[in-house]
């Protein structure tokens, strides 16, 4: 089996995809103890609606898109933004959530109030990042330019592969939309255009056997249109399809060799303002699942606020895992009629019961694996003797 390539060049080790940034959270996370009030998350994900205009072959929201078709109302989005500003989990930590990721469960930019929601969050002092398919990136330019980062899931280097993977011929539309937003942000000297490695637009690339030969081509496009970063990671099998899948055979040896060769070639296009990242540290040697932790402490570190299941757009459901959207076993609160009630259930007996009942063997590739690694090794075992700096 071919050895995995380095994820980033030495000069780029301080980057937004380096999980060691989580070490900055340990003084907060060490307050996570059964029976005590829990600190609120630093980051919260908000899924605005369960609707998408593409059909990616690996969609990890497919389960929820087929079963739930709601969106969160403008009224409730504003209430969420105001609640997150003041949320206080424990008096041992200052109030408020620092960042919101507007992401999955559907395509966020299709929501009619996305711009207003971004403005409300930013005005409340909360940083915003967005993951989008880019088809509607040409709308709400002013609001989008106020985000810290936007990751666009292009996942291809040619129109042909884009259509094969995503079901629609929208490659050129997405690339032009990205170019336009980058130019707009620079012209208005907006936050999105700040000269910082983690800010700006990122060309996202989920690796699949269909697109493994187009990495260099995609990197060239990303750099040419002004993206700050090219972020690649292997695709994973969605949680609801794991039973019927062999996660060890998604990528063949030839695919991994091609990936290594392509990413090494792509690094030649790096510059001080453009980075190429092939993120594999949450995967095994076959780019397969590698959830090597004993318990999921991440359920106490973040959450996803999602549309309700009762058809009322003023209500919300709160899940604890972005990789298992729609899995009721990981939902802390269903159909909340008041977002402020989230503070009451956070750290509750039900919260700990969910933690106790999670079987790691049933989990897909874990977005939050390093959260649990750090909790187990740095906080519980003090393997790094972190007080000795």
Predicted feature locations:
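Flexible, acidic/Gly-rich N-terminal and inter-domain linker regions that tether
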Residues: 1-43, 54-58, 318, 361-366, ...
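Immediate flanking context of iron-sulfur cluster ligation sites
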Residues: 346-363
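Conserved Radical SAM active-site core
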Residues: 66-131, 135-146
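Detector for the c-type heme attachment site
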Residues: 59-65, 368-369
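Radical SAM enzyme [4Fe-4S]-AdoMet core and its adjacent flexible, acidic
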Residues: 1-17, 47, 65-78, 124-127, ...
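Hydrophobic packing within well-folded, soluble alpha/beta domains
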Residues: 52, 56-59, 117, 121, ...
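N-terminal pre-triad scaffold of radical SAM enzymes
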Residues: 32-58, 98-103, 298-314
């Amino acid at each position: 089996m071919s050895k995995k390539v380095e994820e980033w060049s030495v000069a780029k080790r301080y980057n937004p995809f380096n999980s060691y940034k989580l070490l900055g959270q340990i003084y907060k996370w060490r307050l996570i103890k059964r029976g005590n009030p829990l600190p609120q998350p630093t980051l919260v994900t908000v899924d605005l609606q369960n609707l998408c205009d593409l059909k990616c072959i690996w969609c990890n929201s497919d389960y929820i898109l087929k079963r739930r078709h709601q969106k969160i109302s403008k009224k409730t989005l504003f209430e969420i933004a105001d609640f997150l500003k003041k949320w206080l989990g424990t008096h041992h930590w200052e109030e408020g959530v620092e960042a919101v990721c507007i992401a999955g469960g559907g395509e966020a930019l299709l929501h009619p109030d996305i711009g207003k929601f971004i403005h409300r969050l930013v005005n409340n002092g909360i940083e915003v990042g967005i993951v989008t398919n880019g088809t509607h990136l040409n709308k709400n330019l002013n609001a989008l330019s106020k985000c810290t980062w936007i990751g666009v899931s292009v996942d291809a280097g040619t129109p042909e592969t884009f259509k094969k993977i995503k079901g629609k011929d929208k490659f050129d539309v997405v690339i032009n939309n990205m170019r336009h937003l980058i130019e707009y942000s620079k012209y208005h000297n907006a936050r999105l255009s700040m000269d910082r490695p983690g800010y700006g637009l990122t060309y996202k690339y989920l690796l699949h056997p269909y697109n493994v030969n187009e990495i260099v081509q995609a990197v060239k496009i990303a750099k040419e249109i002004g993206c700050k970063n090219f972020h690649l990671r292997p695709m994973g099998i969605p949680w609801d399809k794991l039973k019927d899948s062999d996660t060890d055979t998604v990528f063949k040896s030839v695919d991994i060799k091609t990936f290594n060769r392509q990413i090494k070639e792509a690094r030649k296009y790096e510059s001080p303002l453009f980075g190429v990242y092939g993120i594999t540290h949450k995967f095994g040697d076959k780019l397969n699942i590698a959830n090597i932790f004993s318990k999921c402490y991440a359920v106490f570190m973040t959450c996803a606020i999602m549309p309700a299941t009762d058809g009322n757009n003023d209500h919300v459901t709160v899940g604890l895992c972005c990789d298992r959207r729609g899995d009721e076993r990981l939902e802390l609160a269903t159909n909340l009629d008041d977002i402020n009630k989230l503070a009451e259930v956070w750290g509750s007996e039900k919260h700990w019961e969910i933690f106790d009942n999670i079987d790691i063997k049933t989990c897909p590739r874990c977005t939050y694996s390093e959260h649990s690694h750090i909790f187990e090794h740095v906080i519980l075992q003090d393997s790094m003797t972190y007080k000795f700096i």
